[in-house]
Every structure is written in C-alpha cells, then in structure tokens.
C-alpha cells in the first residue's frame, strides 16, 4: 500500500474540518496520517488448545474465538493521550494498514467488545478505560470480551509500523519497522467450576439431594482494558453504570438474607448465575462427578473480584438442597457456601505451575472446586456455620490448562 495515499487523505480531513461551522460538534483530534500500523493478535492460552494431540472441545474453541477486533490508537502517552483513530476488523486476528500519525502513540486492542468504537472519538485514554462491559454479554456465541495491555510506542513516519511478523500481511509492507511481537489478548472473565460433590466416608448413611447451584457476590461489570501490567492487569469495576447494579446473584439476592458472607446492598438476581437440575441424590457410594468430556458439573463465568474485597463481598459458590442424616432426619433448604479462592476458610488450595499467587478471583483463571459434605449445612446461605459442615478443595488453573477427563468406571 502506498503511503502517499494517506497524505491525500489528510488534505480531505483538513478540508472537512475547515468547512464545518457547527459549534455543537465536539472537537476532534485532527491528525495527519503519514504512516501505517499493522498488527497481529493472539489469545492468551490459545496455543495449548492448538497443540498436537490435544482434544479441543467446541466450548474451548468458542472461548478462544475472535469475532471482532477494535484497534484504538491515541496520540501521546499517559492518561491524557488523545484519541487519534480506530479500526474494527471481523473474524480475523490480523488488522493491516491502519492510517496513523507518526510520533508518540498509545495502542489498545479490544476483542469481542460490546461497545461501538465510535463512542471513543474525542476521548482521552483515561476516559476510554472507564468504559465497562456487562457480564450479560459474555456468551460463547458472541465471544468472550478480551483486551490487550496498554501499549506505548513510537510510530515511525513514512513507514509500515508492525506488531507481529511482516510476512503475515498481504501486500508490500516495505519499508517497515517491527515495533513488537504479536499482541496478546486476555479474557475479562474468570470461570468457577463445580467439579464434584461427595459425602464423607465418615458420614455413612447420609444423603444430600442437590437442588440448586448458584453464584453470589458477582460483579456484573468489568472495565474494557487496564493500564496495569500482567500479571496484575486488573480490569475490576468498582461501580455500575448509571441506573444499573454492581452486585449480581443467582438466587437469594435480597438484603434480608445478608450475613457474614454477604454484606452488599441492593443486589439483583440474574438467571444465568444459577443452575437448577432435576434433583440429584448424592450418597457415600453415589458421588456427583464431572462427566467424561465435560468441564464441570456446573460452570459459571464471572468478573474479577480482588484482594481488597472484605469477607462479605467475596465471590461465592453456593449449593442448596435437602440433607438426610443416617437416622432418616430430613432437613430441607440446607446451604453449603464456598468463598472462592479464599485462604482464610480452611480450604485446601492448590495453584497450578507458574500461576501468580493470589487469593481472590482474577480474570483469565479457572477455579475448580470439589466439595465433601460432612454433616448438615446451614439454614441460611450466607452464614459461616457452613464451614464446619464440609471440606473444600479449590484448584486454581491457568486458562490454557485443558483437563482431559477420564472415563468414569
């Protein structure tokens, strides 16, 4: 592509601005395109799913799918870097030949974003990073939202500026400068998986009838990107958009259910944060385990909820059902409440190799939970009495670790 074409474009842009006299039109950064930007992206963890011999499920393929890519370019660096231009590409990890202005610049890449990038026109970087996604939009069909880190660079004039391999792009890209490698994208969600439920071997004769599994203290919004560097590139939101509610619940969201595990106010119930099966009966000899070819008994996408979170705002996985002891006593509506990845609850916590140590819910990780029932649970979902009734094992897994489930004999 000939760079002189972009010089002609700058004349057109300048003329359009000069001819406008509408004082209501917001002031835009008028830039002179005198270089191009081409970049390649990759989804963090996708390399494992493409490895030879790995059986990749349809679900895992969808988790890595890029439907849209938005490349946002800002002039300058820091919070006051001002919007320069953007490009949206569909169904591709490559975005070639974006007309840009040379000089100090900041780049942010968004995947599967629910926000029209035109909303960012005239905005500063700090303003753009305040935008949020909703957990309602995090579906496999539309694609999981992702973002790059905030990249500061210097774009060279009269040059094709490239992130990735120049040979990945069609056409002549000479002269060029490689500004960096392929840009990695990180999902905004974490995943909480219930892997198994069983009755303790010391609790012979007891039965638990599982009737519902739901999430609580889930943040319904996440920022679209972060300036923080990996592994602490948090996108946690601490407020909901105007008129919306930050804290979401699969069930029991009302304030009068509050206890030590739930101190939030004015929450909202969201159907997809609950799983209600036909009643499943669990005994010492009938363990509820993840089926072959499945990831979990029940699985939920959630947003980040970080280490400063008090006990009453930590993300929870709650099981509800009927407990029958070995004497036949029936106790309905019993709860087993698990504070996800909480080191202070006496759980067995296991972290995968090379995982940054953390004790909260962090994006792009899976939290795999196994529950052993020792006795009757609590009659309220958010009271800590449930801890004495169960043993919990939580495995923190990097997103790219694919578990190969064995056949259950």
Task: Describe these PLM feature segments.
Residues 19-409:
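Extracytoplasmic cysteine-anchoring/structural motifs
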């Amino acid at each position: 592509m000939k760079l002189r074409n972009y010089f002609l474009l700058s004349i057109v842009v300048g003329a359009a601005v000069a001819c406008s006299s509408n004082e209501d039109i917001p002031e835009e950064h008028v830039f002179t395109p005198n270089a191009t930007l081409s970049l390649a992206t990759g989804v963090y963890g996708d390399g494992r799913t493409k490895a030879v011999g790995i059986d990749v499920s349809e679900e895992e393929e969808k988790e890595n799918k890029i439907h849209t890519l938005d490349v946002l370019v800002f002039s300058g660096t820091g919070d006051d870097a001002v919007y320069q231009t953007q490009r949206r590409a569909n169904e591709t990890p490559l975005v070639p030949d974006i007309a840009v202005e040379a000089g100090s610049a900041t780049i942010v890449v968004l995947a599967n974003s629910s926000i029209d990038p035109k909303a960012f026109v005239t905005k500063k970087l700090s303003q753009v990073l305040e935008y949020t996604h909703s957990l309602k939009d995090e579906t496999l069909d539309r694609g999981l939202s992702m973002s790059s880190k905030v990249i500061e660079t210097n774009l060279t004039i009269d040059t094709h500026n490239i992130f990735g391999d120049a040979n990945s792009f069609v056409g002549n890209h000479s002269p060029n400068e490689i500004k960096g490698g392929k840009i990695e994208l990180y999902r905004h969600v974490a995943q909480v998986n219930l892997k198994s439920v069983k009755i303790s071997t010391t609790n012979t004769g007891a039965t638990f009838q599982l009737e519902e599994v739901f999430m609580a203290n889930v943040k319904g919004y996440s920022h679209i990107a972060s300036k923080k560097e990996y592994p602490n590139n948090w996108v946690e939101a601490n407020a909901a958009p105007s008129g919306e509610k930050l804290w979401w619940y699969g069930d029991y969201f009302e304030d009068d259910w509050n206890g030590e595990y739930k101190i939030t106010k004015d929450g909202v119930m969201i159907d997809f944060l609950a799983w209600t099966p036909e009643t499943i009966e669990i005994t010492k000899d009938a363990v509820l385990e993840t089926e072959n070819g499945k990831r979990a008994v029940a699985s939920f996408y959630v947003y980040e909820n970080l280490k400063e979170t008090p006990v009453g705002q930590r993300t929870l996985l709650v099981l509800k059902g009927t407990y029958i002891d070995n004497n036949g006593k029936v106790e309905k509506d019993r709860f087993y409440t698990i504070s996800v990845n909480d080191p202070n609850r006496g759980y067995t916590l296991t972290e995968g190799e090379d995982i940054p140590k953390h004790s909260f819910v962090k994006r792009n990780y899976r939290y795999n939970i196994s529950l052993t029932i020792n006795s009757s649970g609590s009659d309220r979902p958010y009271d800590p009495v449930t801890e004495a009734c169960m043993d919990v094992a939580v495995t923190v897994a990097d997103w790219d670790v694919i578990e190969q489930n064995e056949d259950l004999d």
